[in-house]
Amino acid sequence: PEEWFNPGSTEYDSILAYNSYDVTDYLQAGENAMGAILGEGWWTGMTTFECTNNNYYGDQPALMAKMVVNYTDGSSDTVVTDDGSWTYYNDGPVRLASLFQGERYDATKEAAIEGWTEAGYDDSAWTTSSEIETRKQFADYQLVSRYDEPVHVIRTNDVKEALGETKEGSGSYIYDMGENVSGVPVITIPEEYAKPGETVTVRFAEILYPELDEYTSEGVDGMLMVENYRTAMVTDFYTMKEGENVFSPDLTFHGYRYIEITGLDQELPADCIKMQVLSSLDASAEYESSNELTNQLFANITNSTTSNYISIPTDCPQRDERMGWTGDAQIYALSGSYVADTYNFMRQWMDTVRADCGETGMSSQYCPAFVNYDLEADDKIPHNGQSFGITWNCLVVTIPYNLYMQTGKLDIVKDNIDNIYAYVDHLASTPMSYKDENGDKPEDARLTGETGTLCDHLSRIPTDGVMLGNVLYINCLDQAATLADVVGDTDKAESYRETAATAREAWNEFFIDPDTGKTKNTKGEIQDTQASYATPLRFHVVSDENLEKVLENYNATIAEASGEDSDGMPIVPYTLTTGFNATGNLLNALSDYGLNDTAYKLFESTDYASWLYPVTQGATSIWERWNGYTNELGFNGNNSMNS
């Protein structure tokens, strides 16, 4: 298909999107036919890692369609889906079509429906359609036209290398597709490779088990590493018909680099196997330097961008998750806008984010939110914007701000400005409460207490979340002031700037030791981590009085890094110790203040942990965790190799 998985993902209890097409060229004189093949999509089946979310919106897919035909004489006809004139057939070749589990296709059933797309097809044996009653929790929705780009094929990859049998005598053969991306296989099977009625199994993996003792002792070295797919089966099954067969699933997608084919009489030649790479976006950026490792890093960034921008921005394209995590999206939205034109894509998803926000403007930790609900209850599902904290929530401000600054387009600001005000006002009205060195819990209204439970998630060294979270609070005030000016709300803008100035003063008072310029937490304990300096420097929160010492300390946390991280791995100079909150701020916080030598050394480091370490290990995408794989410890099992 030219467009995949329409009408895409939204928060279906509030928004049902549709796609429009000009079908003039398809209409012919006399009878015409109109039909559709339905898959689970994001409506039914497995949609998250929570078992309770299976069939979250409904337990069967349905079609809502309308065609308006305007004739040259000024008259018109309207054709709609109804429960009388349409028919359906549920014993076709597609036996299972799950985004997470894969597609099961029986080609022997094609003959029974041959010609079904033609107007003269006899559907008298088919079943008359009936209306599917929407669960009451999802019956009050707004029907809207999508304005983002549909998922589509962005390129087709060939096999890089045929790796032979998984294990001798297994009858399973592995092929390396060259890069870890999102897509589906296209497999041509000549008739001499399998008999009609036989089933071919296709499995997928991001990576193979290496020849480390941990894996050779278990005999799994060289096999697909699928444990990080968790409960997602990620397997396609194809039942052969007569003659040459071509299998290309189009109601699922997988995140993978390697495929394993089982069930053929002999190894399939590599030129019989292709990969259709899928994304909502076409990458438009190019990067080339004298350092081949950084060139590959940029290619990896591009792969992870396109792989995770499939209808919504996801955390991973392969396992039982693939959810619109707000923290991940917030962190990467600005960078992603350099890789591709993300404006319409992000604007569309922000509709879902707003639908999941409560009155405070706080977003969910992922959107759609999949809030637990009672099937028997009459109330609409409550959206209270629960998440891990400001690193996740602040997307309601930062994404509209960054996309406006990148494009100059106002729609995304106008769409979100009321929610931005609600969120920033909520932060400002929730005073910081902390435990001081005496064990008391005073409050300070100059800073916010709405910082959450996680901040610099997945860092190698922890940093106080209240301190970092309040930097993001100040940044939200700054950005909200700019956006208020953009929409002509000058009084609001001035109010936010005054609040930000007060918050900056308080932040420096609370979190900087005036004698050493080192950062500290609310108890007065010295932090002195890369994150504790990078984030406040990036967002210009450090006062002029503290700046010189803070820069010296920040530079030292990189150039003189030492010790061990929480995994017992050594920390060496010019390597990273940061996580969600601060990693994206490291280089800006150096280059903005003239520390360019340190910035280049940090960027080009190949030691663990660094941006280039995964590249030296053969990565073709961005790993979720610094310790996704190390030579010393092997794989971290709960890990996406494409985030």
Tell where the protein language model's regions lie, with residue ranges.
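Active-site core of glycosidic bond-cleaving carbohydrate-active enzymes
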Residues: 42, 324-643
